[in-house]
Each structure stands twice: as C-alpha cells, then as structure tokens.
C-alpha cells in the first residue's frame, strides 16, 4: 500500500478513484507524564513522552485509513492529510484522511 500526501504518484497513473478513506485515534493523557513534560518545557528541550504518544496515535490513524482503503480494493492512498486536535479532558485526537485509488 502506497501512502502519500501528494495528489498523485509520479509515473503511476490513477486507474480508478475509490473514495475518501479515514482513520482516527484518540489517546488519553497521563498526569505523571504531563507533569514531567511540563518540567521539560520549562527547562527547555523536547518532550519525548508526548512525541512518542503523537507518533503512536499518528501510526494508528494511518493504519486504520490504509486498512479501509484495502477493503475498497485500493493499492494506494493519495492526498493524505493528518490533523491533530486536543479534545476534552486532555484527550488527543489524530485523524488521517485521503483518497483511495488503484494505480
């Protein structure tokens, strides 16, 4: 399965557009991790705990989207957009969407 943010794949014409596909992941926050992330932010540096959480949520959303595309008979997803949003109570939502295609 080819996944790309571009609207097409160079050298590979789209044979069929199969529709919009999406994937979502909602991850909860951890109070202890939040505390240490805040300390990291105060003293400078990167928050590894949050980076791991974001990476994991993004991968879940992309995997769900790719699986939906496979069910439609696609072998690629083009025009992928990934969005991040904090929802109530510190929950993090990551969504991935794109167009399932046959190339």
From Swiss-Prot:
InterPro entries: UPF0145_dom_sf, UPF0145_YbjQ-like. It comes from the Bacteria. PANTHER family: UPF0145 PROTEIN YBJQ (PTHR34068:SF1). Belongs to the UPF0145 family. This is UPF0145 protein PTH_2690. It comes from Pelotomaculum thermopropionicum (strain DSM 13744 / JCM 10971 / SI).
């Amino acid at each position: 399965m080819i996944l790309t943010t571009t609207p097409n794949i160079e050298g590979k014409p789209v044979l069929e557009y199969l529709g919009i596909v999406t994937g979502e992941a909602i991850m909860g926050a951890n109070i202890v991790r939040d505390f240490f992330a805040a300390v990291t932010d105060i003293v400078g540096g990167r928050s590894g705990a949050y980076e791991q959480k974001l990476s994991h949520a993004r991968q879940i959303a992309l995997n769900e989207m790719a699986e939906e595309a496979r069910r439609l008979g696609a072998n690629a997803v083009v025009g992928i957009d990934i969005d991040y949003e904090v929802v109530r109570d510190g929950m993090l939502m990551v969504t991935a969407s794109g167009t399932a295609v046959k190339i």
